[in-house]
Curated annotation (Swiss-Prot):
GO terms for biological process: 7-methylguanosine mRNA capping; cap snatching; DNA-templated transcription; symbiont-mediated suppression of host cytoplasmic pattern recognition receptor signaling pathway via inhibition of MAVS activity; symbiont-mediated suppression of host gene expression; symbiont-mediated suppression of host mRNA transcription via inhibition of RNA polymerase II activity; viral RNA genome replication. Influenza RNA polymerase is composed of three subunits: PB1, PB2 and PA. Interacts (via N-terminus) with PB1 (via C-terminus). Interacts with nucleoprotein NP (via N-terminus). Interacts (via N-terminus) with host MAVS (via N-terminus); this interaction inhibits host innate immune response. InterPro entries: Flu_PB2_2nd, Flu_PB2_6th, Flu_PB2_C, Flu_PB2_CAP-bd, Flu_PB2_middle, Flu_PB2_N, INV_PB2, PB2_helical. Transmembrane segments: none annotated. Plays an essential role in transcription initiation and cap-stealing mechanism, in which cellular capped pre-mRNAs are used to generate primers for viral transcription. Recognizes and binds the 7-methylguanosine-containing cap of the target pre-RNA which is subsequently cleaved after 10-13 nucleotides by the viral protein PA. Plays a role in the initiation of the viral genome replication and modulates the activity of the ribonucleoprotein (RNP) complex. Its main location: virion. The record marks K627 as: Mammalian adaptation. GO terms for cellular component: host cell mitochondrion; host cell nucleus; virion component. This is Polymerase basic protein 2. It holds the Pfam family Flu_PB2_7th. It comes from the Viruses. Belongs to the influenza viruses PB2 family.
Length: 759
């Protein structure tokens, strides 16, 4: 009331009215700027002059009971005067110091849990090592990077549901927690945050940091994983860089890295199978990365890499609309073209059918180590501005751009025949043929391209055919720039289609990706990748194939057993036996198969000769196309551990060891599982099966010629005698029976007789 009276009093004086009405507009605008709205216009200044006051803080009245009026030095901590316009107390900054030193202690147990991402960052920085600072020109390009180390990969909506469920469990509103990761995180966080006193809003903010990937489009030269991005301001400036090794890894970077490795392995493997697309999907669905299903990761993870994008396309997910060629990501920034097929002649007079793009187009090209801007017309490179880490990287980019331009002088620079094939031994398409050719040797290409004098343009220099820089001359249309070309920033995703051979096309039919574009770089995954699909057994080498094949038979023994007796051909054709074939020496594969199939047929024909362990042991050998021959084997060779190792047809070996007592099978010393049913111990072995319809007369008798194979016995006439090879290389004399009636008793007596004959 007092103030209003005072103001009225002021207004009644003519000078006041004059100042307020005649002040020029610009002053008025400034007054308005600083006095309108709730938003503080100059926070730093405001803070300075507030802190210069004695009591800049207001607090609830209850504070007077919790804090003494004066501290130990006798300084006043709060004022007895009330804050104007509210019933709060005016407090000195010294009160905050007093509170921090002498105030009540609360439990700190929840802090590391809530502020987990901060605590972890401190640890990483504590254990990180900073190296020397180098002053040099920094070629930075803007890339979309993950700025938030240590997060799960939930979508914003999924994270929102989890946060609501954890922080405000009683709040109304439909929340559906569906994915495995959502449920796990919710359960874990609810347990961690029991009796937590930190404000729910703060908890919600911190949870968001932990659950959602945050990306920014930042200029980077060097590492792009999130543990490098968090120290970007410390490691690279405009003209300097500081070496840094992170003091720890975070799961999200590991997931990204392992996902790329898994996807590359899967695409490479699928490309060589009979139906690449079906195989790829089967492998993606049967693979786990760090214990999480690969398909779940693909749905959530925004990593853009050729193999990863092929897997996403196969699953019907949207991917970036840029396309890949020669390991560079191309994005058309202007122009357009129409496609037509044209036949061209190489320098070796080989005819190539290429799809020519007619029209003027501009592209950005972004690779791991070089970037470029390309302007081209129909079969003509107009301008290429490249920047890269080193000579090698710049050369790679130039080769890719020259091939992409489809210029005649490039095609004429081909020496020799083009016959590059992919992993499945299929010829590559003409554009990739040309690319592979010049990646091997680009000397002729660069020499034939032509050179031109250049103008002096800031930040740009010329490059000669031998890749040396020059300020006078350059290869036609090609310049090297100090500035990098930014990655394509948009995160928009396009609907794409994929064909059986894993070629990904946009809706206008342009090929964006194909298996040829998948990098051959091998890396070691940070997280365990578990491939359940048999196609990926060979990824970890021969031993893994061996163990996995036998594990598969044991796991599926009930169905395998039925197929073995009723429909063996179908069983032999199962894809699970495919990888095993690569372990069997090629020259003898067919003979092993014929031998084992004959053996199995005899087991089927004769009651009581079924031997589970032996069937399991020999089954993978029967999968190869059989060759019928006279050969008998007492052991079969497999190539593992760099040499041939033997699997004994009868009995155990280091490769295949079945313990009858424990019913456990070990393959190369690794546990391959337990047999649920006991092989019938009492039955005679293979010999009795082999020798039905024959009478065993005794030991080998040389007068009756060389030992015959089991197959050849069927050619004997009734009553004819012959030596026969049985079991593990033992030979006995037999006679073909004159009557068929006694065949059944043979199998029982054969065993006893063989033992006598041998011993």
């Amino acid at each position: 009331m007092e103030r209003i009276k005072e103001l009225r009093n002021l207004m009644s004086q003519s000078r006041t009215r004059e100042i307020l009405t005649k002040t020029t507009v610009d002053h008025m605008a400034i007054i308005k700027k600083y006095t309108s709205g709730r938003q503080e216009k100059n926070p730093a200044l405001r803070m300075k002059w507030m802190m210069a006051m004695k009591y800049p803080i207001t607090a609830d009245k209850r504070i007077t009971e919790m804090i003494p009026e004066r501290n130990e030095q006798g300084q006043t901590l709060w004022s007895k005067m009330n804050d104007a316009g509210s019933d709060r107390v005016m407090v000195s900054p010294l009160a905050v110091t007093w509170w921090n030193r002498n105030g009540p202690m609360t439990s700190t147990v929840h802090y590391p849990k809530i502020y987990k991402t901060y605590f972890e960052k401190v640890e990483r920085l504590k254990h990180g090592t900073f190296g020397p600072v180098h002053f040099r020109n920094q070629v930075k390009i803007r890339r979309r990077v993950d700025i938030n180390p240590g997060h799960a990969d939930l979508s914003a909506k999924e994270a929102q549901d989890v946060i609501m469920e954890v922080v405000f469990p009683n709040e109304v509103g439909a929340r559906i927690l569906t994915s495995e990761s959502q449920l796990t995180i919710t359960k874990e966080k609810k347990e961690e945050l029991q009796d937590c006193k930190i404000s729910p809003l703060m908890v919600a903010y911190m949870l968001e940091r932990e659950l959602v990937r945050k990306t920014r489009f930042l200029p980077v030269a060097g590492g792009t994983s999130s543990v490098y991005i968090e120290v970007l301001h410390l490691t690279q400036g405009t003209c300097w860089e500081q070496m840094y090794t992170p003091g720890g890894e975070v799961r999200n970077d590991d997931v990204d890295q392992s996902l790329i490795i898994a996807a590359r392995n899967i695409v490479r493997r699928a490309a060589v199978s009979a139906d690449p697309l079906a195989s790829l999907l089967e492998m993606c669905h049967g693979t786990q990365i760090g214990g999480i299903r690969m398909v779940d990761i693909l749905r959530q993870n925004p990593t853009e890499e050729q193999a990863v994008d092929i897997c996403k396309a196969a699953m019907g997910l949207r991917i970036s609309s840029s396309f890949s060629f020669g390991g560079f990501t191309f994005k058309r920034t202007s122009g357009s073209s129409v496609k037509r097929e044209e036949e061209v002649l190489t320098g070796n007079l080989q005819t190539l059918k290429i799809i020519v793009h007619e029209g003027y187009e501009e592209f950005t090209m972004v690779g791991r180590r070089a970037t470029a801007i390309l302007r081209k017309a129909t079969r003509r490179l107009i301008q290429l501005i490249v920047s890269g880490r080193d000579e090698q990287s710049i050369a790679e980019a130039i080769i890719v751009a020259m091939v992409f331009s489809q210029e005649d002088c490039m095609i004429k620079a081909v020496r020799g025949d083009l016959n590059f094939v992919n992993r499945a031994n299929q010829r590559l398409n003409p554009m990739h043929q040309l690319l592979r050719h010049f990646q091997k040797d680009a000397k002729v290409l660069f020499q034939n391209w032509g050179i031109e004098p250049i103008d002096n343009v800031m930040g740009m220099i010329g490059i000669l055919p031998d890749m040396t820089p020059s300020i006078e001359m350059s290869m036609r249309g090609v310049r090297v720039s100090k500035m990098g070309v930014d990655e394509y920033s948009s995160t928009e995703r396009a609907v794409v289609s994929i064909d059986r051979f894993l070629r990904v096309r946009d809706q206008r039919g342009n090929v964006l990706l194909s298996p040829e574009e998948v990098s051959e770089t091998q890396g070691t995954e940070k997280l365990t990748i578990t491939y359940s699909s048999s196609m990926m057994w060979e990824i970890n080498g021969p031993e893994s194939v061996l163990v996995n094949t036998y594990q598969w038979i044991i796991r599926n023994w009930e169905t395998v057993k039925i197929q073995w007796s009723q429909n063996p051909t179908m069983l032999y054709n199962k894809m699970e036996f495919e990888p095993f074939q690569s372990l069997v020496p090629k020259a003898i594969r067919g003979q092993y198969s014929g031998f084992v199939r004959t053996l199995f047929q005899q087991m089927r024909d004769v009651l009581g000769t079924f031997d589970t362990a032996q069937i399991i042991k020999l089954l993978p050998f029967a999968a190869a196309p059989p060759k019928l021959s006279r050969m008998q084997f007492s052991s079969l060779t497999v190539n593992v551990r760099g040499s041939g190792m033997r699997i004994l047809v009868r009995g155990n070996s280091p490769v295949f060891n079945y313990n009858k007592a424990t019913k456990r099978l070990t393959v190369l010393g690794k546990d391959a599982g337990t047999l649920t049913e006991d092989p019938d111990e009492g039955t005679a072995g293979v010999e009795s099966a082999v020798l039905r319809g024959f009478l065993i007369l005794g030991k080998e008798d040389r007068r009756y010629g060389p030992a015959l194979s089991i197959n050849e016995l069927s050619n004997l006439a009734k009553g004819e005698k012959a030596n026969v090879l049985i079991g593990q290389g033992d030979v006995v004399l037999v006679m073909k029976r004159k009557r068929d009636s006694s065949i059944l008793t043979d199998s029982q007596t054969a065993t006893k007789r063989i033992r006598m004959a041998i011993n």
